[in-house]
Amino acid sequence: LVGSEMFIRDRLRQTYKHTPIIIGGIEASLRRLAHYDYWSNKMKRSILLDSGADLISYGMGEHSIVEIADALNSGLAVSDITFIDGTVYKTRKREDIYDAIELPHYEEVLADKAAYARSFYTQYCNTDPFVAKRLFETYDGKLFVVQNPPAKPLTQSEMDQVYALPY
């Protein structure tokens, strides 16, 4: 993260202590798992860990952001939002990760280009929202970043509703 992003994150946490921070958009989507950063010329961890955010909404977020809002509005803690397609979450509980493909550990990806290639290939093969599996990668043997399958695309009717909004 750059200084301004860290400043904003810190001010949000300071001002709104109990408000979940959910990130999305192109940067979060492309950096949701371990990735090569061209600016620094090195491998980086998931932006979920480095940003201090609670959750990532990746890809087209029209469905997932509404589901996240509904879950939070119903009283669910952000740490319990682990089931929404199009999201990435972090956990320390390996036993709670089910029906998922384990990617090479972050430390392995750092040390071995072939491990990164395997990870990237697995991610690439799981981009179709109709057949994709849940993926996860391990950090330091005790922290897990879990990517749920991509959100389903909008129907024509849903697309019309979204683009009829006054923005």
Task: Kindly give the residue locations of the regions a language model identified.
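Two-component system phosphotransfer/interaction surface
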Residues: 60-74, 156-159
